[in-house]
């Protein structure tokens, strides 16, 4: 009987792809992720701007309408949780997560690639090329450090565990069962503050990758403020 070849892990599959193709894939995903990350922040503001002083929620009559509003808010919270976790899923050959981008850039001499980008921007100025190259490298490595930090972040762990509960309609996850078997409590769902912090980190890392790998930029603060104003205008129009 012929022996069954062991299946390659996702990281092993990625490592067999030529360096040039890996970098192009990383650049493509980094570009596509920016809009998705902005939409994630948009969901956050859609929830936040519904509450507060003189908000839509404060003007709702005490009637059955409140029940519908609460359902919408719950679904937005679930969407925020699920969308956040999609960005932090494990690296996959055809994936689009942040760890996937990092894995595609591994062992590709990324700093040399970033130097070519800097050189193309300042072909006749070595000093400017060097300075800009340092800036691109700093952005990339900042993203790398934030990814390593996220790997041990208890907030992300709680959020991913809750995502598994709601996405797969589970009373408890495997993680919950393991904790209970050890006499520990299941992980609590993420708070609104946790989802907000993870969403901001997600957008920040997505921007760092996009700006370094694709030499692209956008007004970070302006984009976030625009999302806030749109949500505020939306709920205000319903009041």
What is each of the regions a protein language model found here?
Residues 2-154, 182-239:
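Amphipathic alpha-helical interface segments
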Residues 144-178:
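Histidine-centered, metal-coordinating catalytic motifs and their short helical/loop contexts
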């Amino acid at each position: 009987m012929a022996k069954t070849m062991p299946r390659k892990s996702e990281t092993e599959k990625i490592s067999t792809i030529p360096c040039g193709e890996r970098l192009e894939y990383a650049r493509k995903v980094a570009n596509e992720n920016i809009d998705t990350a902005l939409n994630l922040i948009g969901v956050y503001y859609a929830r936040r701007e519904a509450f507060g002083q003189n908000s839509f929620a404060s003007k709702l009559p005490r009637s059955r309408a409140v029940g519908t509003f609460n359902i919408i808010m719950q679904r937005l919270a679930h969407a925020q949780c699920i969308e956040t976790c999609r960005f932090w899923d494990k690296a996959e050959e055809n994936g689009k997560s942040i760890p996937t981008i990092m894995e595609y850039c591994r062992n590709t001499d990324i700093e040399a690639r970033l130097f070519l980008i800097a050189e193309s921007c300042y072909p006749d100025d070595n000093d400017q090329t060097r300075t800009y190259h340092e800036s691109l490298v700093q952005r990339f490595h900042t993203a790398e450090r934030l990814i390593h930090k996220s790997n041990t972040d208890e907030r992300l762990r709680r959020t991913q565990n809750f995502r598994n509960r709601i996405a797969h309609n589970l009373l408890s996850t495997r993680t919950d069962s393991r904790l209970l078997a050890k006499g520990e409590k299941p992980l609590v769902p993420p708070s609104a503050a946790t989802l907000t912090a993870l969403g901001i980190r997600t957008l920040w890392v997505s921007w760092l990758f996009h700006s370094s790998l694709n030499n692209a930029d956008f007004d970070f603060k302006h984009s976030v403020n625009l999302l806030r104003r749109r949500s505020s205008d939306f709920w205000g129009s319903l009041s």
